[in-house]
Structure formats: C-alpha cells, structure tokens
Curated annotation (Swiss-Prot):
Glycans are attached at N99. It comes from Homo sapiens (Human). Widely expressed, predominantly in liver, kidney, ovary, spleen and peripheral blood Leukocytes. GO terms for biological process: acetylcholine receptor signaling pathway; cell surface receptor signaling pathway; host-mediated suppression of symbiont invasion. It is found in: Cell membrane. It is a lipid-anchor; GPI-anchor. This is Lymphocyte antigen 6E.
C-alpha cells in the first residue's frame, strides 16, 4: 500500500490533460451538409472559424454560396461584410465542435434597397429629361 499511493500520485501528476480543440472542417462547399467532418486541431489552434460568402439579390436571384470551416490560432475580424449583392460572414468559437452551423454570410442585399439605390442614381437623368 505504501508503494501504491506514490505510484498512483506520480501517474496522475504525469498525465497531461488533452486540450486539443476539435472543429468541423471543409473548404468551399455549397452546403453545410458537406461541412460536418470533425477535425482535431493542433495545439496552437484556439478557435474554430467559419467563413460564409454569398452573392445574390434578396431571395430572388442567387449567384453563388461558399462555406469554409477550419481550425485557427487566431480569430479573424468577426464582422460581416455586405457590398450590395455580395456578402461575407465570419464567426469564431472556442469549444468542442462549436462551429456546427453556418456563419451569417448568407445576407444579401434587399430588393427594396437595390431598387431605391437605382432610382436615386437615375434621378438626375430623369430630372434633366423631364417635362
């Protein structure tokens, strides 16, 4: 018994805690269904990152969608970018398989907003050729 306790204590102290993060990973997929492959991240990776990019006009026209998921040592700026008909969303998380869902990059310009912008851009021409 005197030998068992020190051996047990040494074994417990010598065991290193497994701290590797686990994330879903994929590259340039069209659907989240193809992005459910679990990956064990390296010890330097602290984040699961999801990048979603799309282009389209409201729900009327879709030009394309791309979804990528990976492990990363740092989180890129987690803000969405929307430039009219194209948008990109980035999301980061730090827990076990936390990047299950897609980032919010599916945002598209609204038809109303695009129509208003078009009318405002044509307003000078309409006023010039008016009655």
């Amino acid at each position: 018994m005197k030998i068992f306790l020190p051996v047990l204590l040494a074994a417990l102290l010598g065991v290193e805690r497994a701290s590797s993060l686990m994330c879903f990973s994929c590259l340039n997929q069209k659907s989240n269904l193809y992005c459910l492959k679990p990956t064990i991240c390296s010890d330097q990776d602290n984040y699961c990152v999801t990048v979603s990019a799309s282009a389209g006009i409201g729900n009327l026209v879709t030009f394309g969608h791309s979804l990528s998921k990976t492990c990363s040592p740092a989180c890129p700026i987690p803000e969405g970018v929307n430039v009219g008909v194209a948008s990109m969303g980035i999301s980061c998380c730090q827990s076990f398989l936390c990047n299950f869902s897609a980032a919010d990059g599916g945002l598209r310009a609204s038809v109303t907003l695009l129509g208003a912008g078009l009318l405002l851009s044509l307003l000078p021409a309409l006023l010039r050729f008016g009655p």
